[in-house]
Amino acid sequence: ALMGNHNLPVAVQEQLGRLLDQGHLSVASGAFSYDQVVRRSIKELAASGVDAITYPSGHTDKLETVVLRAMRTGINQTAMDISQHNAESMDVDVMELTAHGGARTGDGKADFTNHSWWQGKLVSLSGQPGYLTLDDIGYGDVRGFAGANCRHNWHPFWPGVSKPAYTQETLDEYNRPKFPYNGQLLTEEQADRRQRACILGLYGAVR
């Protein structure tokens, strides 16, 4: 549901979906930059009276948050789908997950909500023993791999031939607190969260 100063018509709800679809295609094709598409979408929706989105759960997000998350998620899912299609066309069953600093830690346990736990590891599309499964990484769950705001991807991996892209030392370094802020050290995840808050504020200011 869309929330503004009044109950908004279905036409405005459809506008949100249309703008996000068009924005995704514009960025994926290279016609416009990510920043250009986000700014345009936010301005058009704001002009229609939309300033926040309320989900069935009752949770409400600001317009800037919704647009940024939808664009980022859609673009990454397209890249992930291409990688999976390439693997299947080559009859490859094992995929190597990418890794990056600032991966979310979820509840801190060894489960799919903790992206820093499974990133950089190998996953079997068919569920072969000795590898992570699609369930282990939360494939298909909004909180897991390729879910909302997830920046991870995966690539075909040939056991016995391919060389792992990440060492355990590299993965550990991603999670080490090393960014100074107000007299304390932040992990990259914490620093990214603060940076995103600043970016959202800037997008809101230029509406």
Question: Model segments located where?
Answer:
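Residues that flank catalytic or metal-binding motifs in active/ligand-binding sites
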Residues: 148
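Domain-core detector
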Residues: 1-145, 158-207
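Catalytic core of tubulin tyrosine ligase-like
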Residues: 152
